[in-house]
Each structure stands twice: as C-alpha cells, then as structure tokens.
C-alpha cells in the first residue's frame, strides 16, 4: 500500500491544500463532547443531573474482575469511557478534551485521532487493571471505574509530544486566585508526575490515578504509530507564521528554535515512564506468584420497581465462604444480600447438592449493625434455590419482603433505626465458580510494560520528528486556561 492510500484510509491530509489543513474543524472532538454530555444527561436524570444513577455504573462501569467472570463484559472498555460520576467530573473532563483535543485532532486528522482516543481509553483500563492487582490485590479489581479521563489522558500525552511550546494560563487558589503562564510541556509534566505519585501512594482513594498515567503513556506510544510524518512536517512549516487551527498562534523571533522536548522535560518524563515500567514488571512477577480463586455472584434485584444489579465475591476460609464486596454494591443489592445471608439462604451446609423451594414463610435472622446484632424479620413470598456440594447458593430467584435498617455513622458514634415500612425485593442470583483474576492481571501487566517501553522510546529518540511547535517558538498565545 502506498503512502497516499494509507493516508486516505486514516484521514491523512498530507496531499491536501495547506490552507484547508490549517483551518480544519475538529469535528471528532466536538462530537465526543456532545455524546458524553448527552449520555450524562440520560444517566443522571433520576438525580436531577447532579450525579449518575448507580444502575448505570453497575451495567456500564469497568470492573476488571468481570472480564474474568464473562468475556461478554469486554463491552465495558467502551461504555465506561462515556459515563461520568457527577457534574464536576464531566465538566472538567470535557473542558480538558476541548482544550487539548482540538490541536491533537488537527495534527493527526480526525480518523487517526479517534483511533488514538479510543485505544488510549483501552490502554488506561489495562494499566488500571494491572496496577490495581499489584497494589490493591484481587479485591481492588471489584471496584468499577468510569469516565473519559483515561482516553483524554492519551490526548494529553500526544499533546506533550506535538505541542510542547504552546503556553497555557494556569490558576490555583490560595486564599485568592493566583494565575501564571507556562509552557504546556511543564504543565503536562507536572500533571503526569502527580498521577504517577498518587497512583503509587493513594490506592483506594476513589480516583483511578494509574488509569490516567496509563492513558498518558498509551497516547505517547500510539502517537508514534499513528502520526503521519508528512503531515507533521507540513504543520510544522505552517506554524512558522500566524496560527494553527484558529486557536494556536505563534511568532518565531530571535530565540533559537530547539527541536523536540527540552532536555529537562525529556529526562523527567522518561524517569516517570521508567517508574511505571518498573511497576508493570513487578506486576508481571506478582501475577505469576499470587493466585487467588473466588466464587463470584451476580445479583439482579428490583426493590419496589427500582432495578439494580451488582457482583459480590466469596473467598473460602476454614471451609466457610467469606462474603467480600458488599460495601461496593448498590444499597438495594446490599440489603437483599444481608437478608438472604441472615435467613440462611446464601450458604447452608444442610442444603448441599439440593434444590429447595420456600413459599409463604416468615423467617427470622440477625444482621450485624453498629457492633451489635439486630434481629430482623424476612417474609419469603417465594424462593427457589440450587446449592452446590458445599451448600453455597449457585442459582436462586424469588421474592422476599423485609423492613430496612437505616444506619447513622459518625466519628465515635453509630446508631440505627428499623423502618416501619416493608419493602419488596424481586431478585435472581447466579454464581460463577473458581474465578481467578491472576492470568488477566498478568496479561495486562505485560501489555502495560510494552506500552511503557514504546512510549519511552518515543520520548527519548522520536520526539524531534513528531514535534510541531517546539519550546523554542515564541508563543503569542493559545486559548488555554487550566485549573491547578
């Protein structure tokens, strides 16, 4: 395939008229923003557009363990990129995409840019999985991750290599707002360093820092594979007098132009990527050594018409199942699990190898709350369950009714009250046996290592051929304001 046909397939403008290239509209960036906003409006409507509904997180979020449970969950690589937790989450993600995405799309062309965006999101999920297993163990793979941050981080990584010489106005707040201007290379280096530092030190913080770092690395690696060098050279020449795409403006003065990244930035970025590479290598060996097998239960429940789905995990100790992950699921799923457990329907050695049916019975159980055991009544309208040879429920469905315990927890204080209302739960449960996440973590650790090494190669030896606006350019301005 010749150069021209390859450029046509991926949207290269190498043979296009220069002025059209210079003024190209970033339609993919705008479209991604619109799609994300529309999805957010749909998924957050039940909360008045303040935060996403938990049901969408359960069905569309990326929980790595679910790839092991059922390969059909591969769709979560993509759906998770378009889900956002709350209004601030989507606002800042879309703002950063708008700020940095337009220039990267202009440099790559729309089709190549879309490929980089989507593959960076997948790369971010791969890093997230590998480092979650290394730093947090198998339980960390149960937590669903959502957001476009990983894909956008790939755009930031590409922007660092393409436009290190653009200037951004950054603002932070210390009593009063303090604003200053700096090269994008320095801002992105600082941002990347924060992700790596907090990724290693803030496990379980509720933010997928390693997904951000992994997306950034994937973006650099993919840029080296997707960039049309012919197009880059043309844009580099066009940047010498005027503006690019209507929002990046330059004047080349007497300052001597330096190609590629500055030595300091290059060394710092390379060091950070090396730290990620070391972690990926450690994750490779850790995944080979540490094997943990779980039984995974998928629960679908409707509480008075409010539908939820969730996953919990059993780990066997001393011949009894320890239920993990109840604190990570939707409240309706958690309440149902507590009732089934209290009623002796999740695990009962006396039911080993049997199928049972219960209709119209009232059972009593206890639930641990605030350091004590609270008696609760459970009405079994209907229950059909199949148990394995250990007495673990592997298939179950039915309808139960029960009051709810409202718990109030504060520092040094815990109280509860049992509601007078009785709530109905219609549910189904399926248990997947012998789930081992170590092979998945091993594969993803190897991929993370390879992406890190490729990006390291790009930063150290290929940045000069990919740069469009080096630091040596005197930047008149670029439409960029970033919060710190």
Predicted features along the sequence, with ranges:
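Non-catalytic terminal regions of proteins
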Residues: 266, 289-300, 360, 366, ...
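Membrane-interface segments at or immediately adjacent to transmembrane helices
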Residues: 287-361
């Amino acid at each position: 395939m010749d150069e021209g046909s390859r450029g046509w397939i991926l949207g290269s403008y190498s043979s296009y008229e220069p002025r059209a290239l210079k003024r190209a509209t970033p339609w993919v960036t705008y479209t991604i923003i619109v799609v994300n906003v529309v999805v957010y409006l749909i998924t957050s409507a039940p909360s008045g557009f303040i935060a996403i509904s938990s049901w969408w997180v359960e069905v569309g979020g990326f929980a790595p363990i679910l790839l092991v449970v059922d390969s059909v969950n591969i769709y979560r690589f993509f759906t998770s990129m378009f889900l956002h937790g709350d209004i601030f989450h989507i606002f800042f993600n879309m703002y950063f995409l708008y700020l940095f995405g337009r220039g990267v799309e202009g440099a790559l062309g729309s089709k190549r840019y879309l490929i980089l965006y989507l593959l960076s999101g997948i790369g971010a999920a791969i890093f997230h999985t590998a480092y979650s297993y290394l730093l947090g163990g198998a339980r960390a793979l149960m937590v669903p991750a959502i957001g476009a941050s990983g894909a956008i981080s790939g755009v930031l990584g590409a922007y660092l290599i393409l436009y290190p010489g653009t200037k951004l106005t950054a603002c932070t707040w210390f009593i009063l707002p303090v604003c200053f201007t700096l090269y994008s290379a320095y801002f992105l280096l600082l941002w990347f360093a924060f992700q790596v530092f907090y990724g290693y030190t803030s496990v379980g913080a509720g933010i997928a820092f390693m997904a951000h770092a992994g997306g950034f690395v994937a973006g650099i690696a993919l840029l080296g594979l997707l960039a049309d060098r012919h197009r880059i050279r043309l844009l580099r020449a066009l940047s010498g007098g005027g503006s690019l795409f209507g929002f990046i403006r330059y004047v080349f003065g007497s300052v001597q132009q330096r190609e590629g990244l500055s030595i300091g930035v290059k060394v710092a970025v390379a060091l950070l990527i090396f730290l990620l590479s070391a972690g990926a290598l450690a994750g490779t060996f850790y995944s080979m050594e540490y094997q943990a097998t779980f039984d995974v239960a998928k629960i679908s429940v409707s509480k008075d018409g409010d539908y939820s789905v969730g996953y919990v995990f059993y780990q066997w100790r001393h011949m009894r199942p320890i239920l993990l992950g109840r604190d990570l699921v939707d409240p309706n799923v958690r309440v149902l699990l507590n009732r089934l457990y209290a009623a002796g329907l999740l695990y009962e050695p006396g039911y080993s190898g049997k199928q049972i049916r219960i209709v119209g019975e009232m059972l009593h159980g206890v639930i641990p709350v605030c350091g004590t055991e609270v008696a609760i009544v459970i009405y079994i309208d209907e229950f059909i369950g199949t148990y394995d040879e250990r007495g673990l429920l592997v298939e179950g469905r039915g309808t139960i009714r029960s009051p709810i315990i409202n718990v109030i927890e504060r520092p040094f204080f815990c109280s509860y009250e049992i509601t007078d209302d009785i709530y109905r739960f219609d549910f189904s449960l399926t248990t997947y046996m012998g789930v081992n996440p170590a092979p998945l973590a091993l594969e993803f650790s190897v991929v993370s290592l390879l992406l890190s090494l490729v990006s390291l190669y790009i930063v150290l030896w290929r940045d000069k051929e990919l740069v469009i606006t080096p630091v040596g350019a005197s930047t008149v301005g670029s439409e960029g304001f970033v919060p710190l």
